[in-house]
């Protein structure tokens, strides 16, 4: 039995059973590192929530805060789907910055490697515009979750932007 916002829901849908290692709440175990050629490097903390309601998708919500000032940074929410009968995975993401993306890739054991196949933004999004995103999430042998995000902006090639590790808190 699983819980979602206090309500009891059905068992995990078999379609997303290969992603059960993500379920729960994860908190950064130390501040992550953010950098990009066009910004001042920064440190951040982040909480990840992965849940389900018995459908063939995993729901997620990511909340990041500046490590020193504690000001809110990026917020991401969305869904993870698996193409039935394959290891093909899709991340469908909406960010508080007005960016929406679809990332697709592969699930290999307990790691996800994803690359954007579509990136859209609000008409008044901040420039330079994000053109491409890649994400690597893996469960380490010590039980920590690690995430690395790279991005490309207009006129800049794909470059690592974020790196952080988490510990499960529930």
Task: Explain the meaning of each model-derived region.
Residues 53-56, 85, 107-110, 140-144:
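Short, solvent-exposed coil/turn segments at beta-strand boundaries
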Residues 45-51, 76-81, 102-106, 132-139, ...:
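Hydrophobic/aromatic beta-strand elements that line small-molecule binding cavities or substrate pockets
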């Amino acid at each position: 039995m699983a819980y979602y916002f206090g309500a009891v829901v059905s068992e995990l849908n078999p379609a997303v059973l290969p992603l059960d290692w993500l379920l729960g709440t994860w908190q950064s175990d130390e501040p992550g590192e953010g950098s990009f050629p066009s910004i001042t490097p920064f440190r951040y903390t982040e909480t990840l929530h992965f849940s389900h309601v018995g459908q063939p998708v995993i729901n997620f919500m990511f909340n990041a805060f500046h490590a020193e000032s504690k000001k809110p940074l990026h917020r991401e929410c969305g869904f993870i789907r698996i193409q039935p009968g394959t290891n093909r995975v899709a991340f469908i993401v909406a960010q508080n910055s007005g960016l929406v993306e679809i990332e697709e890739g592969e699930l290999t054991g307990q790691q996800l490697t994803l690359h954007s196949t579509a990136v859209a933004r609000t008409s008044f999004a901040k420039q330079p515009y994000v053109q491409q995103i890649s994400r690597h999430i893996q469960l380490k042998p010590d039980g920590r979750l690690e995430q690395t995000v790279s991005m490309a902006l207009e006129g800049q090639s794909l470059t690592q932007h974020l790196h952080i590790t988490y510990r499960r808190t529930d």
